[in-house]
């Protein structure tokens, strides 16, 4: 992209933008929640649409001059409904957290009981963490993974639901590498008279391409971000049954947000169009293949994988047997150009600021063009770095740079 105007107006910010571009180009990005947008998405984000205020919804705005942005938002809504086979869509949420908040405010009262996945077992802050608004406003009861299999035990979820009678069951995760059984969760919700909300922020791209079962037929609400496996701008979306459309829209605007970000909604529309193309399914298939190969390669070096593998785009690695914490592994690998994040593991014994594990994802590197052979090399580099953490890391930095040079970012 051309940053001539930025360079003239603000050299410091222009320099930092360039610096970040170089960091991304010369690093292997394994953070599961990150991806690289297309130039088309980026151009939409930096378009004239950023100038327009448009409180309300298409044909029901509180400002004049909205006829063009109405078309933009309508396109985004229609495309995402087609992508997921949904009855209603709201594309205004600024983030996944705000998407979840809007659903909660649509059907819950303060203090209502909700069943959600424990953050330390793979859930998300907004699924009831006591430090988050969700855990502060509502009575969340957490479910986790089985101690032996490290996967969700649906009978345990059912028992908790029968005991606590939640008004809402929340499914979805930020660090869970296995298929989630939405049909069974719907049956549990029906048994106790609960609503079902599914947060597919991490797996949206897999769901859209049929590589993970869709929650849309089963859930009352489905929320997501647009910037992870969907490869779009940073933002959120909500899908729901038509009967919830009015109450949901009201709880986004004027409930928790004012004016929507029309340049971001345009970029969402572009990413939905891209996700409807056959090439996007090919991309997502490669994401999953890469995750499988990377997982197998890491296992061959003695790394302990939570649940012994992956069905999706991410891998949760328990480093307990490697004599290194998640925090130290993150810092070590960052120093050679591999970016990932420390992450709690089931039955965690360390602080969330230290952790016993790391989370690894393949969406971003797959966007760059990395395939199976590169996964084997990445696993080898990670193993060598941790094994030789107090040794000379320069050869490993060179191996990372060589991989990055083969696959330019743009």
Swiss-Prot record:
Its cofactor is pyridoxal 5'-phosphate. Keywords: Amino-acid biosynthesis, Cytoplasm, One-carbon metabolism, Pyridoxal phosphate, Transferase. The record marks 227 as: Plays an important role in substrate specificity. InterPro entries: PyrdxlP-dep_Trfase (IPR015424), PyrdxlP-dep_Trfase_major (IPR015421), PyrdxlP-dep_Trfase_small (IPR015422), Ser_HO-MeTrfase (IPR001085), Ser_HO-MeTrfase-like (IPR049943), Ser_HO-MeTrfase_PLP_BS (IPR019798), SHMT-like_dom (IPR039429). (6S)-5,6,7,8-tetrahydrofolate binds at residues 119, 123-125, 351-353. It catalyses: (6R)-5,10-methylene-5,6,7,8-tetrahydrofolate + glycine + H2O = (6S)-5,6,7,8-tetrahydrofolate + L-serine. Pfam families: SHMT. One of its GO terms (biological process) is glycine biosynthetic process from serine. It is an enzyme of class 2 (transferase). The modification N6-(pyridoxal phosphate)lysine is found at residue 228. One of its GO terms (cellular component) is cytosol. It comes from the Bacteria. Pathway: One-carbon metabolism; tetrahydrofolate interconversion; Amino-acid biosynthesis; glycine biosynthesis; glycine from L-serine: step 1/1. The keyword Transferase applies. PROSITE patterns: SHMT (PS00096). Catalyzes the reversible interconversion of serine and glycine with tetrahydrofolate (THF) serving as the one-carbon carrier. This reaction serves as the major source of one-carbon groups required for the biosynthesis of purines, thymidylate, methionine, and other important biomolecules. Also exhibits THF-independent aldolase activity toward beta-hydroxyamino acids, producing glycine and aldehydes, via a retro-aldol mechanism. HAMAP family: SHMT. Belongs to the SHMT family. Homodimer. This is Serine hydroxymethyltransferase.
């Amino acid at each position: 992209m051309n940053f001539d105007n930025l360079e003239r107006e603000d050299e410091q910010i222009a320099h930092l933008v360039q610096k970040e571009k170089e960091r991304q180009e010369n690093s292997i990005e394994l953070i599961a929640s990150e991806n690289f947008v297309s130039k088309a998405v980026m151009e939409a984000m930096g378009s004239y649409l950023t100038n327009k205020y448009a409180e309300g919804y298409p044909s029901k705005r509180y400002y004049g001059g909205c006829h063009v942005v109405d078309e933009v938002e309508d396109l985004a809504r229609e495309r995402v409904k087609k992508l997921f086979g949904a009855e209603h869509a709201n594309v205004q949420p600024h983030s996944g957290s705000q998407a979840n908040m809007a659903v909660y405010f649509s059907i819950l009262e303060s203090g209502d009981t909700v069943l959600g996945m424990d953050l330390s077992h793979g859930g998300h802050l907004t699924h009831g963490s006591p430090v988050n608004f969700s855990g502060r406003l509502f009575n969340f009861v957490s479910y986790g993974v089985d101690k032996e299999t490290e996967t969700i035990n649906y009978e345990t979820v059912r028992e908790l639901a029968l005991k606590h009678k939640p008004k809402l069951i929340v499914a979805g995760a930020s660090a869970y590498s296995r298929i989630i059984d939405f049909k069974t969760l719907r049956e549990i919700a029906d048994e106790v008279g609960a609503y079902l909300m599914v947060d597919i922020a991490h797996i949206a791209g897999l769901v859209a391409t049929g590589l993970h079962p869709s929650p849309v037929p089963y859930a009352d609400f489905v929320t997501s971000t647009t910037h992870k496996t969907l490869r779009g701008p940073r933002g959120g979306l909500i899908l729901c049954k038509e009967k919830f459309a009015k109450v949901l829209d009201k709880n986004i605007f004027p409930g928790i947000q004012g004016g929507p970000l029309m340049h971001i909604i345009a970029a969402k529309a572009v990413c939905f169009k891209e996700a409807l193309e056959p090439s996007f399914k090919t991309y997502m298939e490669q994401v999953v293949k890469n995750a499988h190969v990377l997982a197998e390669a890491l296992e061959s070096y003695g790394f302990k994988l939570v649940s012994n593998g992956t069905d999706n785009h991410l891998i949760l690695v328990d480093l307990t047997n490697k004599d290194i914490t998640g925090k130290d592994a993150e810092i070590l690998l960052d120093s050679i150009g591999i970016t990932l994040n420390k992450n709690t593991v089931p039955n965690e014994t360390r602080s969330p600021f230290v952790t016993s594990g790391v989370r690894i994802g393949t969406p971003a590197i797959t966007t760059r063009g990395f395939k199976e052979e590169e996964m084997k090399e990445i696993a080898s580099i990670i193993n060598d770095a941790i094994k030789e953490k107090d040794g000379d890391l320069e050869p490993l930095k060179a191996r990372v740079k060589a991989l990055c040079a083969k696959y330019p970012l743009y």
